């Protein structure tokens, strides 16, 4: 989306966390990843990916110990591009700690 703000929020978050943690951060920009709408013929749980971009996406996510998703809320939900990226994989997400940082025009709620 033009004028997106996730990068600014992610940069701010990384600076805040750098004060109190030794975690290493890498940015994954789904615009740069540019996955097409899910087009694998087999379910992701099988891990039998036919497309090279799916195998690359799988390898990238598998290389991380945990994830922090930073994304805008659209109509109280998450963006379709994120849903699509999540749907491409299955086992790669299993047992991986995840945090969500969201923002939107309607205000935010603290979720626990």
Tell me what each language-model feature is.
Residues 1-71, 76-84, 88:
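N-terminal beta1-alpha1-beta2 submodule of the flavodoxin-like/Rossmannoid cofactor-binding fold
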Residues 25, 95-98:
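Hydrophobic/aromatic residues located in beta-strands of well-ordered beta-sheets
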Residues 89-95:
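Short, conserved loop/helix-junction motifs that constitute active-site signature segments
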Residues 97-112:
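Short, glycine-/small-residue-rich phosphate/pyrophosphate-handling segment
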């Amino acid at each position: 989306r033009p004028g997106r703000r996730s990068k600014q929020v992610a940069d701010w978050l990384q600076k805040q966390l750098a004060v109190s943690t030794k975690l290493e951060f890498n940015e994954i920009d789904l615009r740069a990843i540019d996955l097409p709408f899910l087009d694998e013929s087999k379910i992701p749980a099988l891990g039998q990916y036919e497309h090279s971009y799916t195998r690359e996406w799988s390898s990238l996510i598998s290389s991380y110990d945990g994830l922090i998703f930073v994304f805008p809320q659209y109509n109280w939900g998450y963006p379709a591009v994120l849903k699509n990226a999540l749907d491409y994989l299955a086992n790669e997400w299993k047992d991986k700690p995840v945090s969500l940082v969201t923002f939107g025009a309607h205000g935010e709620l603290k979720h626990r």
